[in-house]
Amino acid sequence: LYDTFFKEILDPNTTPERVEELLSLILKQKVKILKVLPLESPRLGDEQSLIVMDVVVELEDHSIANLEVQKAGYYFPGQRAACYSSDLLLRQYRRVREDLEKQEKRFSYREIKKVYTIILYEKSPKEFHDFPTDYIHRFAQRSDTGIEIDLLQEYVFISLDNFHGI
């Protein structure tokens, strides 16, 4: 993958329809980008060198999607993704609270929408190599009893090296 290629082809500011189509296919639902959000999370120096692209968008239903492309996967991919997803969820919470306060409206947790963390790996972490014929891995929190509570965070990991090996 080439940094400039990905950034040019999948730039939500200039070609939102491409990012919408990709996200629609990945999330298995129609996606419309409402706006591109600023990247506010600090990145460590070595992390920045491995990230090809990192885009955060607000979707039409006000959910948040973070689309990241990495040259090589990090150690502890689940923990890292959970931390960034939690950061996005907290940013959304603060933004929604502030917006409602400005409008002099009462806050409700119902206003907080889902956060999707989507990571494409050029060279995926070793955990993904145990599943060489699978290249899309979806995660969502589920109860062991069957009760359904929306915990707002979903993850999709895409191993491009596994895909190329199929």
Regions found by a protein language model. Name each.
Residues L1-I166:
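Elongated, amphipathic alpha-helical interaction scaffolds
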